[in-house]
Regions:
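Sec/Tat signal peptide C-region and signal peptidase I cleavage site
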Residues: 18-22
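Bacterial N-terminal signal peptides
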Residues: 9-17
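Bacterial N-terminal signal peptides that target proteins for export
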Residues: 1-8
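Sequence context surrounding c-type heme c attachment/ligation sites in exported
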Residues: 23-145
Length: 145
């Protein structure tokens, strides 16, 4: 499985899990919905062509990229966009959480790649994502409750 496919699979798994119970499913951030509408015809262009400084997921359509940022990251960590981003300077890399998120994406890809190589599990369905560890909190739980 390619790193991009592993990332997309993990994000889709997260989105599916969140939407499984529509009453409990988090609603899309109104700001993200507005941004997607403002994209107009650029919504289906690759994120790397639409946004500045996209280093990972460059080929993901811009509208899906924003939804991944919203559901896959913001909601998975229980934060707002400005936790990682400087508002109105989204491309800026000065915040440590944004740089850490990139490292975590690479770690997630590596784990998902190795999950796909395991022979004693259903590797087609096995995937980890941000929610796997973070569960809505910035700091993952390090012990069972």
């Amino acid at each position: 499985m390619t790193p991009m496919r592993a990332t997309i699979a993990a994000v889709l798994l997260t989105l599916f899990a969140i939407s499984a119970n529509s009453e409990d499913a988090p609603k899309e951030n109104a700001y993200v919905t507005e941004l997607i509408q403002q994209l107009g015809p650029n919504a289906k262009k690759p994120a790397g062509e639409v946004f500045k400084n996209v280093q990972l997921m460059k080929d993901v359509p811009a509208d899906r990229f924003l939804r991944i940022m919203d559901t896959g990251y913001r909601q998975s960590l229980g934060v707002s966009c400005d936790y990682c981003h400087v508002e109105d300077r989204w491309e800026a890399d000065e915040k440590r959480p944004k740089r850490a998120a990139r490292e975590m994406i690479l770690m997630m890809r590596m784990i998902n790649k190795h999950l796909g190589e395991l022979t004693e599990i259903d590797s087609q369905a096995a995937a980890v994502n941000c929610t796997t560890c973070h569960r809505g909190y910035v700091k993952p739980a390090l012990q069972m409750r």
